[in-house]
């Protein structure tokens, strides 16, 4: 058991930062990112013996995190809660940066799931198109289209919010 723990920690340490960024961006508006990380890591550790390819540990964590979020969404829908807590702690030094990050995460939350995940993995986590295609089991061209469409929709969403703010100040 101690050997499993050591191996798990050895695999987790180098992927902690990208995993945390993924959870922050992906969990926005659904649950607190630290809760997502903890639940994902608990599941990953208890089912660690099922990991067949240790070099794909980060993908393994992403898959679990996505399923945890899906289950969370189903619980919320089943319980018929009318509102989801949209407060997520974002650790950025400047207030302007925090506000911009908050706006970006709100806009990302509006995008369709596939476009949102592709953008998060590519722009925030730093994955290549090829890695995302492998993770999502799609062609690289399909991922490029998701990224392109997602960026366009994100631009429209953020532009319309900026225009509405500018109009409010006039």
Predicted regions and their residues:
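Structural recognition of an alpha-helix C-terminal capping motif at a helix-to-coil junction
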Residues: 35-42, 55-67
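A short, charge-rich alpha-helical start-of-domain segment used by transcription regulators
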Residues: 1-21, 25
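C-terminal edge and immediately downstream basic/flexible tail or linker adjoining helix-turn-helix-like DNA-binding
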Residues: 2-8, 134-135, 151-170
């Amino acid at each position: 058991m101690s050997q499993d723990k050591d191996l798990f920690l050895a695999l987790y340490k180098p992927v902690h930062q990208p995993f945390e960024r993924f959870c922050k961006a992906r969990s926005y508006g659904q649950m607190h990112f630290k809760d997502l990380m903890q639940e994902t890591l608990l599941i990953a550790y208890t089912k660690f013996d099922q990991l067949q390819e240790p070099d794909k540990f980060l993908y393994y964590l992403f898959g679990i995190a996505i399923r945890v979020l899906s289950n969370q969404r189903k619980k919320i829908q089943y319980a018929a809660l009318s509102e989801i807590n949209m407060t997520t702690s974002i650790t950025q030094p400047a207030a302007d940066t925090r506000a911009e990050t908050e706006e970006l995460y709100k806009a990302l939350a509006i995008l369709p799931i596939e476009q949102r995940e592709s953008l998060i993995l590519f722009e925030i986590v730093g994955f290549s198109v090829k890695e995302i295609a492998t993770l999502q089991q799609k062609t690289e061209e399909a991922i490029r289209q998701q990224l392109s469409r997602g960026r366009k929709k994100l631009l429209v969403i953020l532009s319309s919010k900026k225009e509405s703010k500018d109009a409010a100040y006039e």
